[in-house]
Amino acid sequence: MAKAVYVGVGSKARKMKKAYVGIGGKARKVKKMYIGIGGKARLCYSAEADKFGTATPLSKYRIFLAGTTVGGYALFGGGGYDSDARKGEAIMDAYNASLTRTTAASLSVARQGLTAITLGNHALFVGGRSGDTSFGTVDVYDASLTRTTATELSIARCDSAAAVVGSYALFAGGRRNNGLFTMSQSAVDAYNTSLTRTTATPLPSNVYACAGGTVGGYAVFSGGSSMNSDSTLVETIGAMEMVRAYDSSLTSSKAAPLSCPRAVHSAATIGNHLLFAGGYNSTTGKYLSTVESYDASLTRSTAVELSSAKNGLASATVGEYAMFAGGYKGNSDAAYVATVDAYNTALTKTTMPDLSVGRYGLASAVIGDYALFAGGISKIQGPAYKYQDVVDVYSA
């Protein structure tokens, strides 16, 4: 567990976020501090990431939920839990900086496979599906957890990707179910801080299960599956290498492609790097451990690989670490992965203590110094599956 030091400022205790010492005329960052107690060195401060433990479980176990942050809360909304995880839930769980859980106003429409992101003082929960119906619903939560709705997506869909650039939150790709068939989508909807929706240039191909993130002045979307499929997000067909970038004026440009096709991967920004990690390559039929980095000029490089090849992982950036947790790596009792890898601003990888339960289809959100990984599904043994309500907490 990470340790903290507090200093008195204006009669209030303020947490020290960083500490430096002078060495050879240069400021060097302190990673750990110790104090002597009873003749022994005791750790009193750590700037390194670690596992904190678990928080109060979700109010209901579920998979394919969405997580993000607003005000002083980490929010986890929606999800599914029936025999095939297609039926949606409207639950909204909120965790404060003390990791106390409350229940906020429910989503206006019960759904799973939705996408969430924070834009200014609002948390947006967008799209999703329940059964064979897709939704374009946009639920908005403010810092007091009051829920309103914004203009719907231009096309109802689930399994889209999100990223923020400038004053816009972009929602790209996804797939639409209408009860008869499923169609992947290329639409990119942009919402500004006034929650006005505009339509940006579409992606070059119809895709779902792509990944999105922000670096420099760009929102970047990569990969995804081009195949029209109503299958689960375990082994997608038609994965792609495409990478598309949008600047703050919503101008679209092409970036260097991924090194290989991938879908159901995850993205996180750390420092000047946007990382795309894991996924499934339908061309080779292999799960991926590859981590690709895009800098502010959209130059692509590779980082140290994940400790396990997998897709369906969750990601979060907390402190100076981008974390990738959980996932799925094949049809076996050991397919549901518990590993957690953390990358610092130098892209040095640290393997963290495992999740309490290996699982897939989990969601993440950050509150204060904590990254929370919630929900998902695990395989117990043989044909037995278990939907999860566990919330693992990592600190930095």
How would you name each of these model-derived features?
Residues 23-28:
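A short, compositionally biased N-terminal segment around positions ~18-40 that is enriched
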